[in-house]
Amino acid sequence: MTFSSHTKDILFSEINRMDLERDNFSKRPGLDFSRNRKLGFKDLIRFQISMQSGSVNHELMKYFCYHKDTPTLSAFYQQRRKLSDDVFQTLFYRFNSHYPPICYKNKYLLLACDGSSFSFTRNPKDLDSYYDPNGRSVNGFNQIHLVALFNLLSQRYLDAQIQPIRKKNEFLALSNLIDRFDPPPGTSPIFIADRGFHSYNVFAHAIEKGAYFLIRAKDVNTKRLLGNDFPDTDSFDVTVNRILTRTQSKKKHRHPLLEDQYRCICKAVTFSYLPDDSDAEYPISLRVLRFPIGEDSFENVITNLPEKEFPSMEIKSLYGMRWGIETSFRK
């Protein structure tokens, strides 16, 4: 059996398994999908994941081999409304569970995170995703933003967050992906991301999860983080200790001798581990690296990977692997 056939068999077996548990994936258990219909639970799932770029009517005709009794568009919409919101997420997780991850150094999971926007069926009533007519579209269009988690060595997507384009928040998306990722026993995830994901809140979520991160940062953010500790060299590898707080009052700081380490997180900025009106403090230790990637160009990365096990050249190599998720979007 070819790999593609084996993969398809696994996918269909999981759909069949969910069909036996369809009450768990129905909005009205015991009522929805209780009658025999041409477009039952199993075919409804298979049809939607096999759809291509044609109209729904045309895709229905293809799926049912142009049979005269092909379900109508209305029938499809009626059946689709019966599905629970988590049905495809559950199928995605169950399907992935059949493929053990490939680890780096027999322990680490290299998980790249990146976002991309996609247009979908025009609906001006969906204000969270709709753009008015402009130079890109005379009729307007709708978009969603997807932030995906991709295993660089296994070449598989493991999870994703979908947001309406007008509520796009990549910091929140990555924090949620970190929180709900459940690594296999004996493994540790390394979340690798581009500079759009650089934030104290993302760093803290990974640390609280017992995970590692490797995230690129702009020059201005690196200098703001390091402050007066920013080395005047083209490359460096330094550890920075910071104490995060919600208050700007030095009188409320618990460690006056470490005043230069304090950074105030204003109320407008999300930080999950400091309530808005709290005097609490959150110490955080970060490793900041800068290395050349060309004659006059450099990269800055922030990580919590241990220096003894991950020297600077290895960090550079690991970050370079992040491009695997960029190319995966185009495959």
PLM regions: where:
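Short alpha-helical "recognition helix" segments of helix-turn-helix
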Residues: 59-65
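Small-residue-rich alpha-helical segments with characteristic i,i+4
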Residues: 133-134
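Single, function-defining residue in the core of a domain
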Residues: 1-54, 62, 71, 75-83, ...
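Short Lys/Arg-enriched helix C-cap and helix-to-coil transition segments
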Residues: 87-100
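Conserved beta-strand elements of the Class I
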Residues: 109-111
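Short, flexible, glycine/charge-rich loop motifs used to bind or transfer phosphoryl groups or to couple energy/partner
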Residues: 66, 100-101, 179-182
